[in-house]
Amino acid sequence: MFKLGKRSIERLQGVHPDLVKVVERAIDLSPVDFTVLEGLRSPERQQTLVASGASQTLNSRHITGHAVDLGAWVDNQVDWSWPLYHKIANAMKAAANELGVSIVWGGDWRTFKDGPHFELDRKFYP
């Protein structure tokens, strides 16, 4: 079983409490260790990410604390292997379902698939 590290906990500061609960439960369920790469994001940081092509919107859910990016943590570093993100997503979805929280995974998007990205569903968290 894995647990969130100090840095991950710090990066969850400012994130909506329901999403924090999902992440905290998912780390218990996940067969893959993960780290929180980013939670709450400033509008300036978002502009930088859009300019670099790392994001496609200035209206990111990160700006309101309604999104997190998680990185698969393997051999003390982030591993970007896509299959790992499916496993993390399964844990996040199971945790969300268990807690009655509706989330959206960036890996399920039709365009600009974003494996590390999880956000609270706008239908329930406008």
Name these PLM-found stretches.
Residues 1-33:
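Active-site acidic/histidine clusters and adjacent loop/turn architecture
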Residues 13, 56-126:
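Catalytic cores and adjacent binding grooves of peptidoglycan-active enzymes
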Residues 17-20, 33-37, 89, 115-118:
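A broadly tuned "polar low-complexity/structure-edge" signature
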Residues 23-24, 46, 89, 93:
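Short glycine-/small-residue-rich flexible loop motifs, especially phosphate/cofactor-binding loops
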